[in-house]
């Protein structure tokens, strides 16, 4: 229920160029019963880490600078205080050799992931292995690449257009185990999240509006007999 409230509010209250978004105030209001993960490289926590790395480069590579990842640590503590044991730090590995795929993402993941793991241990937050999903099967990567071109108004042969890693399919447990074989606890924590999720059925049947039948039409059955299927 709280998730539905957040999603609805994200579209209505403060959308950005018709893109849904929320702020921390809304999370504080509707966080009960939700599980929160730190997201991909575009998430708040990885972005703070990358900002720290950039500043670190400006400090002549002083990796031991006390404030290098202060903003990232403050971010972790905020979410941990709000969600408790339902807050997880994500790591992803989108290594790719596919032609035309983005190679840079994995390079950044290799730099950011060790920091994520280190900060997770420092703050007592569990790490979870995840994979961005934009299409279902591996062979759908090329179709997705074409759709990205359509949505961004670029040609396939445009070198400066948006590229994905072509690793964003719904990977099997076996594929994820191979990718994260060196961090088995991250895979175990994925199952932990699954066990936490409440099982429920989604009613996929049509939900029709209720139209009151005027008294002069009698019952619903008599109303139905008055008109043919074509009339209706």
What does each of the following model-derived ranges do?
Residues 1-232:
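Phosphodiester-processing cores and adjacent nucleic acid-binding clamps
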């Amino acid at each position: 229920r709280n998730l539905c409230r957040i999603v609805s509010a994200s579209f209505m209250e403060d959308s950005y160029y018709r893109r849904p978004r929320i702020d921390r105030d809304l999370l504080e209001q509707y966080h009960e019963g939700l599980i929160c993960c730190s997201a991909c490289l575009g998430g708040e926590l990885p972005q703070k880490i990358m900002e720290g790395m950039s500043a670190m480069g400006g400090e002549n590579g002083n990796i031991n600078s006390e404030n290098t990842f202060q903003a990232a640590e403050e971010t972790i503590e905020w979410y941990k205080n709000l969600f408790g044991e339902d807050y997880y730090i994500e790591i992803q590995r989108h290594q790719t050799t596919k032609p035309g795929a983005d190679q840079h993402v994995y390079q950044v993941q290799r730099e950011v992931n060790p920091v994520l793991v280190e900060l997770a241990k420092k703050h007592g937050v569990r790490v979870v292995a995840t994979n961005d999903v934009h299409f279902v099967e591996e062979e759908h990567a090329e179709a997705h690449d074409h759709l990205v071109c359509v949505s961004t108004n670029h040609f396939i042969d445009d070198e400066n257009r948006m590229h994905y890693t072509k690793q964003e399919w719904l990977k099997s447990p076996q594929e994820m185990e191979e990718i994260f074989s060196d961090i088995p606890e991250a895979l175990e924590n994925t199952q932990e999240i699954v066990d936490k999720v409440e099982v429920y059925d989604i009613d996929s049947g049509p939900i029709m509006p209720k139209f009151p039948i005027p008294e002069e039409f009698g019952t619903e059955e008599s109303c139905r007999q008055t008109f043919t299927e074509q009339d209706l």
